[in-house]
UniProtKB/Swiss-Prot annotation:
Pathway: Amino-acid biosynthesis; L-tryptophan biosynthesis; L-tryptophan from chorismate: step 4/5. GO terms for biological process: L-tryptophan biosynthetic process. One of its GO terms (molecular function) is indole-3-glycerol-phosphate synthase activity. This is Indole-3-glycerol phosphate synthase. NCBIfam families: PRK00278.1-6, PRK00278.2-4. The lineage of its organism: Bacteria, Pseudomonadati, Pseudomonadota, Betaproteobacteria, Burkholderiales. Pfam families: IGPS (PF00218). The keyword Lyase applies.
Amino acid sequence: MSNILNKIVATKKIEVANRLKQVSLANQRAQAEANNQDVLLKPRGFIQAIEKKITAGKAAVITEIKKASPSRGILRELFVPTDIAQSYEKHGAACLSVLTDADYFQGCNDYLQQARAACSIPVLRKDFTIDPYQVYEARAIGADAILLIVAYLELNQMKDLEACANELGLDVLVEVHNASELEQALELKTPLLGINNRNLKTFEVTLQNTLSLLSMVPNDKTLVTESGILSHTDVQLMRDHHVNAFLVGEAFMRAADPGAALSELFS
């Protein structure tokens, strides 16, 4: 595990312990279950939205709402999640990914709630999930999917977190960075597999990371390429290799109009 991931996970353990003191697990679970009965808050079908785009022959783009990152600092000074969400939806995003980590990405749960309320597309809670408490919390704040990152989770942990998510109607995006992580990810039930093109140790980005792992991905998985998609050439390279789902954040966050940037990149 990289130094930054070590720090994030250590911080996250403290965060979860503190959250438990503020809102009990039972209360989070009750809110999550209540949301599942609410017509406005029940899960919107994250995987379904991606597969619908792909079936229609379109690129399925998960567009990110992210204020800052550890490697790049502040990405967007004028940060209004509702406006960004509406712009993304208007320009054809399949889903949203909203950063809720406060310490390293300057995110918060409110950003996810604001973004989801402003649009009708499904929302991924982009955070560092280590504990079932966070899964219940994700559904309690309205998330439609969660992220599991193989780099810092044991297989049994991931299976438990996935089972918890599925019980609540949450979809799961499992993220890998290399072949050994991919082998573990394939042990999970989720059909949604993300390959991150960013090396979490060096923060270098290369699309070759996705291409080099393609042969290991079974046909029954929906592959999402993450990070480093910056040009029409990048998009076409992936689509030529039958990769039709993308997670893009930084390129859009730096644009004056994130939704217009989405349209331009995938036109």
